[in-house]
Amino acid sequence: MTSPSGTLELHELVLPAHANHRGTLFAGEGLRLMAKAAFLAARGLAQREAVMAAVTGVQFLSPVALGQQLLLRAWVSRVGRSSMTVCVTGLSESPGTPPEEVLKGVFEMVAVDGKGRPSPAKR
């Protein structure tokens, strides 16, 4: 779900296909999910396609076990002419336990036109 302010929530269930050999969320899969949330938040705010220009920071704070739900929250914290900074946090949720912040990252996204060139982000 995306709001007009560029905030998005994405829910994912950690399945065996997402796990590493230790039975927890594979870091590459966590990064993929954060990138997906960043893209959707940027595209929703800009009202046009967006591409990733950079990942300026990612932290994996705690392991996420199989069967846990991952709630990703992404929001646009800065809008330039065509570029946007998107912050993403990930909360791990299990029945009967309070949510725990397990992932966070910052992504630089760029709004693009139909030819893939930078284009003004609609605000």
Describe every region a protein language model picked out.
Residues 1-54, 110-123:
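Hot-dog-fold acyl-thioester-processing enzymes
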Residues 3-10, 65-66, 77-123:
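HotDog/MaoC-like acyl-thioester-processing domains
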Residues 24, 61-62:
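Short, solvent-exposed polar/charged micro-motifs at secondary-structure junctions
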